[in-house]
Every structure is written in structure tokens, then in C-alpha cells.
């Protein structure tokens, strides 16, 4: 009664039915069973019979109903009359080898295409992915690599190909999206520019293109620099000139009653560190009028024409506040001589200086604005700046003398605890040629040394050590010096000192040291004459003595250690001697053969519109004479130094031994 049907149409009669023993009931239905068996086996194909493996049961056994034969019905077929078989219709389900997921690998996609199981594909807009539709209706997505043969494979297998138009689908939105970013960027830049100019965007300082033309000068309606003329020492003549300018601003009637006119400009000239800017700050603190200050380097910037624009803007503001003072520091940055002609291009500084000249004394005039300027390079300034009507006064701020250095030391010692042994006069005499900035640095270094040594006061020792540190560099206390090297350096420095001390009309010896400082293994300090230093006048005998003193170190090495054991320690001495001897022959007229003739003059700076190169204004024969004269001066100085050392060799030994011991 029970039958299992496999998908391959194999039929198996259940063992429980066949194993039943025959009885009367079974025998009665023998004909029906025989007919049923004949029908079933007739439907089995030879292929199905050949498959003798047991098939898994796919579903529960189906109940088959067999009706009893009807005697009233005739059927020509044996065993089949009145037999009705009501069985469910079965069909084998096809097995699919397509992937079950919705995301296929590219290899799976190609296999399906080649087997004809892909009906159509739809590529994305950028071609990086596609969506397929299989023949059974399912859909899947595939990531497409860069395969140039893919389109040909799809076409050969009859696959319908299409391309997506994108997600937007509307060209208007695409155009708007492309224009939106540039518009936002332009609006942002416009907002920043407006903000930098104090427009509706609000005040700000981010800087805009129109802000380049504005002057960056610092303005003080009531200057509070904290500096007055009482704080300026060592520049009495310069201070007097500027005090007159301040008095002109405070009491103009005193001068105009006599027909005097206010100076248009005042140029402060002097070496670096002499107090030019300090004097300008003192003028601002004393004048009591509006004060504009700027650096000349601030005029020239990125864009062409900015320098002239800033000069105009500066003087517009100054004229609105007249009477006032405009201070331009380091004016040589824009006031260099015009017309050099090198490079073939436009120099922005020329436009700036032209505008400055016009504003100071142009067609429109300039009333009530005094221009102060400072420079340490007056030789590079344009001649138009230096003429009357521009900078009417040139105030030279030179290095202070002894009395000026004493007053400067007193100013910079305010607020510092000094010991009783500090003598400003002695310090001033040991610092010839020092500027105000140098003396300020000296006192500051002395205070640092005192603090490093845990002292409560600054003594003369700290000031002396600070002076040597500034001149020669810091001590190399940890330097390992052998006894042989120490002895050599001691005799070398003793030779300098001995020749200098016994040479007539030369500077006195101030200090000898064999402690390494900076690049020097030892130093001999001489105290130059204040009168000679200030006047700048040096006699022939002084220059010859200077060369002999410089050669004293090499002579001492040669006498004590022999010619084969001399060292390179005298290399700088030789350079100094050669320079002095050549100047004596070529420029100073101290040669009998050359006479009072200056030869070998420099050609000037081509960047200042001067000569492009050095011109040789003497013959080769004259050059040979110059060389022989220089060599003769050096040899004469060497013999003088050697004579002094050999004559006083005992003093040399004692001095060297004293240096080694201390």
C-alpha cells in the first residue's frame, strides 16, 4: 500500500508490505496487486533501474488507493480491468548552480555569463559595478575590475547591456552642484577681505589686498616711551641738536619771530649701538607732540607700488596730526642710491624713495611734519636725501669718549648693587671704542656673572671677567692643555708683552693670559691711547712698533724652541702685519720709493651706481716695487722684535714662568 517516489523516477516498494505473510484477504486481492505492480514497473526506465543506490526519502510515503474491480465493466487488458490508481503527479525539480547570495564574485559572474544564465546587466555610471538579472529572474550585484574584454564577452553571449544615468537623474541639480563650491569659496574670501578692512564683516586683522597700501607705522598721540634726554649720555652734541628741534616744536614763535623755518628732517648718523634710536625715543618723550615711528623695511612688501602707497598713507596721517614727528629707522633700506642699473629690472625701492622725497619737500609742501631718520650706512644713501630741504641736519652720533663712557656706565648701573671697589673711570679707560650698547651689555654680563657666583654685589672682578668675555669669548675652563703647549703659549704671549712694553711710544700692556678663550690659546691686552683712538691719527713710528709687537710671539717661539719647532699660532699676527705694511706703502705714503702716491684705489660699489670693477692704475714694475717695500717693512719689524727679545731673554723667561705658575 505504501510507495516512495524518488525524483529520478525510481520506485521502491516498502519492505513492510512485501514481508507480510499471505492470507485469505491478501489472496483475494492478488489480481489487483499484480496489476498494480505491472503498471509501476512498466513506467521505470532502464536508466532508473541501473541506479541501484538507495535514494533518500524526500517525503513521507504516499497512500495509494486501489479500487476493487467492477464486474460490469469489460476491459480487454488482463490484470487491468476496473483498476483505478489515484496517485499524486510527481516531477523532478531542476538543480541550479547559480550563487544564492545577492553579491557575486567576478569569477562567478563570468561563469554564469558563459553558461548563458545571465539575461541582462546594468552598469553603474562610473563603470565600477553592475547589477545582473539571471534567466530565472534573480538579481545580484558585482564589483567590476578593469577588464577591457568584458563588453565583448557579454555581447558574444547575448547579454543585454545598459548603463545607469546616475542617482540624480536631473541635469539641473548637477549644474547647481558644480557651481555651488566656487560660489561659497568666493563668498568666503570676500568676507575675509571685508573683515580685514573693517567693513560689514566686522573689524579684524587678517589682512586683505587693499590693506597692503596702508602704512604699518606705530602712532602715539601722547608718546610714552619712558625715555627722556636725561637717560641719554655720552652723545652731548647730538642731544643738543635734537633738543633744539624739540624746542622748535614747543616754542615755534621764538624762532619764527626771527624768520627761522622749522627743519624738514634730521638724519642721525653713526656706528651701530651708539644710541640713534634711543635719541629718537627721547625726542618722542620730550616733544609732547604726536609721534609716528616705523622701520624703512616695512615700506617694501609683496606687491609693486606698495612702498609708495605706504609713504603716502603715512604722511597723510602725519599731516592730519601736524605738528608731529615721523621717525624712520634704518632708512638705508629704501634710501639707497638710485641708478645702479644692474639686473635690468625695476627696483621697488626707487619708487618708494621718490615718493618719500616728494612728501618731504614736494610741490604741495610739507608744513609741521619733522622727519627723523637713523642709519649706520650714510655712504649708501641717495644724494637727493641728503640735500637741504630734505634732511636739513645730519647729526653724527659717534662713539663716546672717556667722560661719556663714565656717564653711560652710571646710567646702566642704576638698579644694580655695586661693590665699593667698582671704579667707573678705570672701567671707562679699559673700554676704548665701546659704544653705549657695548657698555650696557658689559654691565648686564657682570650682573649675570655675580648671580652665577651667588654674590650679593657686583665687584670689579665680575666686570673685568665680563669685559674679557665680550672681547675674547668665554673661558675654556675644562680644556685639557698639556704642559708643553702651556709652555709654548706662555712664551708666545710673553714675547708680545715684552716687545710691547719695551717699545717706545706704544700702548701699555693691560693684561696677559694663557687661558684659552674662544679660538685663541692666549691673549695679551693693550690699553690704547684715548687721544690717538679718538683722533684717528697714527704716526709712522707707531705703525712700525705695532708690526714689531705683532711679530714678538713668533720671534719668542723661534728663539726658545728653535726654527724647526715654531707653530701656526702666529698666523693672525702675520695677517695683521701684512695689512699694516701694505697700507703704509699703498695709501699712507710711508714708502720712500713709492713716495706720496696712493695706488691701488678701490673701484667702488657697483650696486651704488659707482665703478663696476677695480681699475689697476699702476704698472707691473710699480707692483714689484710695492711688494719689495712691504717685505722690507716686515723684515725690519721682525729684526727689531728679535733684538729686543734676545737682549732681554732673562725677563722673557721670568715672565713666561710667572704665566705658567698662575
From Swiss-Prot:
Query: Where located?
Result: Plastid, Chloroplast membrane
Q: Which SMART domains match?
A: AAA
Q: Which EC numbers does the record give?
A: 3.4.24.-
Per its record, what are the GO molecular function terms?
Answer: ATP binding; ATP hydrolysis activity; ATP-dependent peptidase activity; metal ion binding; metalloendopeptidase activity
Give the active-site positions: 493
One Pfam family cited in the UniProt record for this chain? Peptidase_M41
Q: What's the name of the protein? A: ATP-dependent zinc metalloprotease FTSH, chloroplastic
Q: Give the originating organism.
A: Capsicum annuum
Task: Provide the gene name from the record.
Answer: FTSH
